[in-house]
Structures are given as C-alpha cells and as structure tokens.
C-alpha cells in the first residue's frame, strides 16, 4: 500500500491536535527504532501537558453515541460474524488497493467500503467480549481502509521512496511531488494538505535535529 504514518510535530503530537500523543509504529516508518525510542518521549510530553491544563468538559451526548455504536453488535442475535466481516475488508484491500493502483480501481474499492459500512457492518454480531473486541477492530480497519484509499487517490504520482505505484501516473518521483500529502476529515469532507519531506526542520522548527530535540525533549 505504500508508506504512511501520522504527521507529527516535535512533541510527537499530530499536527494541529491538542492533547494527543503518538508512539511506536504509527509515529514513524523507521521500523523497530520507533518502539525503542518514542514511548518514553511521548509519555513525558503527555505528562507535561496533563499537568498544565484544567479538567475538560465532558460531552455526555458524544459518549452515549459512541457507547451505542460500540455495543450495538452485542444486541444482535444473528447476522454475520467478525471473521466474515474481516475477510471482506481484507479482500477489498487486496483487490482494489494492491501494489499497482489507478484511480478507477481505487474508487471502486472506496465504494465497496462505503457499502460494507452501510450494510454488513450494521449486521455484525458479538456473542462475548472477545468477539466484541474483534468486531471493534474490524470497524477500525474499515475506517483505516478508507483513509488509505483517500490518501492513494490524493497522490497523483509514483514514488520509489514511498513504495507507491500508480499505473495512471507512471512517472516516478517527479519534482513537484517530492512532498508528503496529509489528509483529514473536516465537516464530513476529505481535505488534503502538502508538507515538505523535511517539514520538521523548517519554520517554525529549528534547522537541525539537535536544536529541536534540546528544545522539545523536556529533559
């Protein structure tokens, strides 16, 4: 599918997101080094943040809505099981977001995910806590599948460094596409943003790794 992670600042915080910190494989594409180095760093930043803010206002309506979504599978006695749902999601990714991509096939995959979300995902059941956990994982996989396809559609060029091949855009690493493409959902719409490959060394950050680490490490 290609390389892709959460875009972070020097506090290991998703860009423009307060109070959320990221560690491990979701924070970098440097394989095992992330697991060895980012947990303690992100923990320090989260601890510092927690000590400097007041208690937030809880949205009871949001909590009840999420509880209804999460526990809906345990209210069903029949339908489809989590294994069937997971197999369907994997098949969509295998068939429509494989190593070689193009816009038509990616859009078909996106329509399949939307159909599964509206139909099969509303019929899945869970008979015990174990099955409920697997169902929730499937819901997350469904969301991430859509995120990945939207990201693939946004990058209209192939790239060796990003392990990304577009059949309809075969030129590899054209200069105008030497950048990251981030996506977010805003008011129900998918928005994109360009970031330089070394944005973490550009203003408002310092130009060197050491300067940034010294400023942000909280040691």
Give residue spans per PLM region.
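Glycine- and aromatic-enriched mobile tails/lids
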Residues: 3-22, 26-219
């Amino acid at each position: 599918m290609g390389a892709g992670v959460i875009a972070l600042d020097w506090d290991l915080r998703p860009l423009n997101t307060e109070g959320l910190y990221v560690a491990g494989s979701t924070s970098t594409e440097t394989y095992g080094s992330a697991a060895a180095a980012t947990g303690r760093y992100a923990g320090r930043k989260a601890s510092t943040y927690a000590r400097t803010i007041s208690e937030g206002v809880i949205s009871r309506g949001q909590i009840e809505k999420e509880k209804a979504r999460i526990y809906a599978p345990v209210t069903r006695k029949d339908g489809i099981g989590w294994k069937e749902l997971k197999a369907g999601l994997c098949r969509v990714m295998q068939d429509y977001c494989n190593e070689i991509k193009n816009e038509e096939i990616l859009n078909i995959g996106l329509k399949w995910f939307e159909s599964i979300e509206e139909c099969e995902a509303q019929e899945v059941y869970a008979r015990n806590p174990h099955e409920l956990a697997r169902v929730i994982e499937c819901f997350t996989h469904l969301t991430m599948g859509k995120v990945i396809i939207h990201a693939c559609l946004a990058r209209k060029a192939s790239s060796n460094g990003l392990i990304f091949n577009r059949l309809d855009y075969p030129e590899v690493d054209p200069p105008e596409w030497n950048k990251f493409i981030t996506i977010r959902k805003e008011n129900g719409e998918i928005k994109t943003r360009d970031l330089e490959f070394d944005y973490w060394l550009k203003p408002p950050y310092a130009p060197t790794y050491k300067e940034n680490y010294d400023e942000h490490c909280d040691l």
